[in-house]
Amino acid sequence: MPVLGSQRRLLGSLNCTPPATFPLMLAPNRTGPQCLEVSIPNGLFLSLGLVSLVENVLVVAAIAKNSNLHSPMYYFICCLAVSDLLVSVSNVLETAVMLLLEAGALAARAAVVQQLDNVIDVLICGSMVSSLCFLGAIAVDRYISIFYALRYHSVVTLPRAWRIIAAIWVASILTSLLFITYYNHTVVLLCLVGFFIAMLALMAVLYVHMLARACQHARGIARLQKRQRPIHRGFGLKGAATLTILLGVFFLCWGPFFLHLSLIVLCPQHPTCGCIFKNFNLFLALIICNAIVDPLIYAFRSQELRKTLQEVLQCSW
């Protein structure tokens, strides 16, 4: 990526320098104190990408195989898996080409590598935007299923779900093209940061409201069964833990990347911000980790999907 990820650009591999020996080191900063820089080896990028690739392919295969999973909720989960799949594919492809260029096993002109780099950047940006959108869509779908349970199937219909999915993909592609074209414009970066904050706020409000409703429902059941404290306390702790994991993973994996974008606008020349910029590869690795964790949170918790996944694995063997 031109501004965001110069450390990961393919063009840099045409005239590369030897990688650092130690994964964690203090990087000198001539205008300020020393910086703590975490170096992510290309092999680790490749390994994380492959794990995410396999995991999300299994989710897509399981949902496609089982007709019982052909519902709006699982279609949103499937599209989230496809988005995470594209994040993994783009990073695996970029890392593989970089390793081949560094080893001298692939001879390519700078113009060809530039075009490939642009294609990969569009894939990465588009898949990131679509991934955030489908996380928000899943949150809205669950909210409607809880607060409007009787009207859910009339509100969230398959045609509407398909239109939402198509709109998200089109918007993601257009956004990625605009981002790559106008990456050096402050407005573009601010729009991306604002989009992340909006998704974070949307998910936090919806899931907190859902947790409050679930706890209220549990209290009502507890009063009927005259066992208010044990049920309410256990359910509340479990719900709070689930909410903390869901929002915590989202914030920890995506937050540093969008902090990086914010600092490019706010303090591009400040020494402290420069220290954060040096860890861009770590922020990309966290996004790939999110692509690994998403199936565990949204897909594999479904008993029906796990059962189908076992059938898919047995057929593959």
Swiss-Prot record:
It comes from Rangifer tarandus. A lipid is attached at residue 315 (S-palmitoyl cysteine). Residues 64-72, 141-163, 212-240, 301-317 are cytoplasmic. Belongs to the G-protein coupled receptor 1 family. Keywords: Cell membrane, G-protein coupled receptor, Glycoprotein, Lipoprotein, Membrane, Palmitate, Receptor, Transducer, Transmembrane, Transmembrane helix. Glycans are attached at residue 29. This is Melanocyte-stimulating hormone receptor. The chain crosses the membrane at residues 38-63, 73-93, 119-140, 164-183, 192-211, 241-266, 280-300.
